[in-house]
């Protein structure tokens, strides 16, 4: 008498559909040289947890994976979130590294922005500690659409409308966002399959639906109206962000080329006032933005930049003006002997 044997339960990696695996694999293949170490920033929520599952499924040979978790104590359930991340790491056979941070008040930032800054600083610290140069982030199409709407409502410029980039660098760490073209519904479907398979459940962040926070207000109040009137609007807005990114890159290329004609000197700290005045008003502004960014100066508001532009236009033809001392974020712009300088 023969007996049947039950098929083994699929692993978490087997549960991950191709639609979620492929973008991660493509992002990793594009890295040159290929990384030996990789990390996923995991909060304990569904998005980042499922990105960890996808990364484990497509991890290249010779590459090790870690999960980075930032515990900032803003929520009463923060300890539970950390425990959930450790549980996920155990299921995937991946080490979990945790950084505890405190979000200080009074930095001139809202709580959302302050927490985000603390999170990036903590991730950079973990990356240095473990020799990791590439961190995967789980931002998806819905996040991208919300970001575009928020920046539009805040009056952002062309670069801001490009929203989140698939690859960006900050504090010496490369951040990859392979899911910017993935709808969150696919991620939640995988989270449901993982829960059914092994019982692991993603945590719920109450601030995600608290309309006191700007992003949550867009998500809970504006997005449902757009869903009802324009189904699929997130994909349209995400496409707009890609187009804005291309346009911003073209503008940046023109600004770099223009600045090279301004006789830059002293590692780009100074340029010719007369040559700058030969540019159109729009290109003058872009050249100034490029210059300030190249000197690691925070970008001024549009009004502040316009004031600098006005003062430079009105200087004596030879550029001798001891009264020009345009101060911004601890830096000083001055003009001497026909050249514009920036000092610490």
Swiss-Prot record:
Transmembrane stretches in the record are none
Q: Name one GO molecular function term.
A: tRNA(Ile)-lysidine synthase activity
User: In its keyword annotation, does this UniProt entry include Nucleotide-binding?
Assistant: yes
UniProt enzyme class:
ligase
Chief subcellular site? cytoplasm
List its EC numbers.
Answer: 6.3.4.19
Q: Name one Pfam family in it.
A: ATP_bind_3
Q: Which reaction does it catalyse?
A: cytidine(34) in tRNA(Ile2) + L-lysine + ATP = lysidine(34) in tRNA(Ile2) + AMP + diphosphate + H(+)
Q: Which GO terms describe its cellular component?
A: cytoplasm
- Per UniProt, which keywords does this protein have? ATP-binding, Cytoplasm, Ligase, Nucleotide-binding, tRNA processing
Q: Where is the protein found, in the record's own terms?
A: Cytoplasm
Q: What does this protein do?
A: Ligates lysine onto the cytidine present at position 34 of the AUA codon-specific tRNA(Ile) that contains the anticodon CAU, in an ATP-dependent manner. Cytidine is converted to lysidine, thus changing the amino acid specificity of the tRNA from methionine to isoleucine.
Domain characteristics, as noted in the entry: The N-terminal region contains the highly conserved SGGXDS motif, predicted to be a P-loop motif involved in ATP binding.
| Family per similarity comment | Belongs to the tRNA(Ile)-lysidine synthase family.
Name used for this protein in its record: tRNA(Ile)-lysidine synthase
Biological classification of the source = Bacteria, Pseudomonadati, Pseudomonadota, Betaproteobacteria, Burkholderiales
